[in-house]
Amino acid sequence: MALKSLVLLSLLVLVLLLVQVQPSLGKESAAAKFRRQHMDSGSSSSSNPNYCNQMMKRRRMTHGRCKPVNTFVHESLDDVKAVCSQKNITCKNGHPNCYQSKSTMSITDCRETGSSKYPNCAYKTSQKQKYITVACEGNPYVPVHFDGAVLLPATPVPSLPPPHRLL
């Protein structure tokens, strides 16, 4: 009887430990999520019109719903991380932790087609060269959010002289 109680107690402790540890095992960091959703170093979509359909599924962006828009960056992770060392700009959400690349980068823009309907998500694949903007956080400071891509780099708005007062 004592052995049976010991085994049951051990199993209970094991189950409690697994329940305690399990949520932290399944939690994807923001940096890891950025890499999964946006990084495809050393690859290109130019010869594959089904690139977005394949990658969106492979990278788990069609589970439960079709993600409407996503961008993959075809540069090294180090080159994308280096964007975080540029001068900061304001993100689309108003936060000041966005940074724009100094040069254009090879990207693939994936956009849901009009015929796309979950679970049969369908995407249009467009290969482009654009300046990318990423939000960065953490220590080390790394990309955690893809904020956009533009053809021309952001330019600072020149300051205007103070208005003249009429006397």
From Swiss-Prot:
EC number, UniProt record: 3.1.27.-
SUPFAM superfamilies for this protein: RNase A-like
Single GO cellular component term: extracellular region
Residues bearing glycans: N88, T155, S159
Superkingdom, taxonomy of origin: Eukaryota
CDD domains: RNase_A_canonical (cd06265)
Disulfide-linked positions: C52-C110, C66-C121, C84-C136, C91-C98
Family designation: Belongs to the pancreatic ribonuclease family.
Official protein name in the record: Brain ribonuclease
The encoding gene: BRN
